């Protein structure tokens, strides 16, 4: 398979994609070998190690995080160099092609609204970042201007109609206030400038809602296959109750419950996530799908599991952050005794450590999903079955 050509990488201006010097075939081979090495202690003769799910080489990202440098008349959108200057990355080949005409529109808007780029060395200026996300479902955009203060809000609101006239319908525009002089991407305060406050995405006919500051997969092509695969793995299993821990906006749980409820309307889903805004998104999705017996709650996943002693779901889904689920939750899952476990991970190293603690389970399926081409990172989906079944 070919390599992706990027002049920023070739000229050493941007090294975010550390593996651009490798062909895509090499990248996949290295990732597959890394995953095999990590899970090898848990591979049985009956374990299916499935072929990797590949990504498009370019235009696969649904979001851009642009540091704003330069001047208000000539803003630079891209990354910040060590010397404080900026590199323009508006032609980055990872972004959707719809972003190409958007960047000049945003540069004009910056000038008209007087959003002086923040100068780190001088601690002056207002505009720190522009964060952009696109919905593949309806091409609507979420554009977030990260500002030092609300000083320029009146000017932004004055120029907003001209910006909105050039954006797709159902787009979201907001100001995020980040007053600290530090490399923090966003602050806690979000000011919506549009009535629309969420982007609707759809994977496999399942509506999912993206909110500012919420986590959402950055590679929609691969993410939709990830959720669909989980759905396929469990659809014929005798499952009437499932828990989706670390559920985020509900991607895994909603896909699984939706397919299971077509055969059995009594299937019940409980989704747990510490982020209240993600839970609001998941609840909205369940309502739109018309799913019954679905409950999402904003709690710490480990704490929820420990509180629910005495209840045993047929399926537990875990999709933890990079640190993994940890020993206490793994031991609780052992004691819980659910027949089936789906573990999705963005860090196979911590997942493998968790497998050592999940001693009541054996590994039935493993599949690599190349969510992050041109880097060493990947997503992995696994299916485990209780040994007593």
Curated annotation (Swiss-Prot):
[4Fe-4S] cluster binds at residues 6, 14, 17, 92. InterPro entries: 23SrRNA_MeTrfase_RlmC, MeTrfase_TrmA_AS, MeTrfase_TrmA_CS, SAM-dependent_MTases_sf, U5_MeTrfase_fam. CDD domains: AdoMet_MTases. S-adenosyl-L-methionine binds at residues 217, 246, 273, 319. It holds the Pfam family tRNA_U5-meth_tr. Keywords: 4Fe-4S, Iron, Iron-sulfur, Metal-binding, Methyltransferase, rRNA processing, S-adenosyl-L-methionine, Transferase. Its EC number is 2.1.1.189. It catalyses: uridine(747) in 23S rRNA + S-adenosyl-L-methionine = 5-methyluridine(747) in 23S rRNA + S-adenosyl-L-homocysteine + H(+). Transmembrane segments: none annotated. It is an enzyme of class 2 (transferase). GO terms for molecular function: 4 iron, 4 sulfur cluster binding; iron ion binding; rRNA (uridine-C5-)-methyltransferase activity. It comes from the Bacteria. One of its GO terms (biological process) is rRNA base methylation. The active site is at residue 346. Belongs to the class I-like SAM-binding methyltransferase superfamily. RNA M5U methyltransferase family. RlmC subfamily. HAMAP family: 23SrRNA_methyltr_RlmC. Catalyzes the formation of 5-methyl-uridine at position 747 (m5U747) in 23S rRNA. This is 23S rRNA (uracil(747)-C(5))-methyltransferase RlmC. It comes from Glaesserella parasuis serovar 5 (strain SH0165) (Haemophilus parasuis).
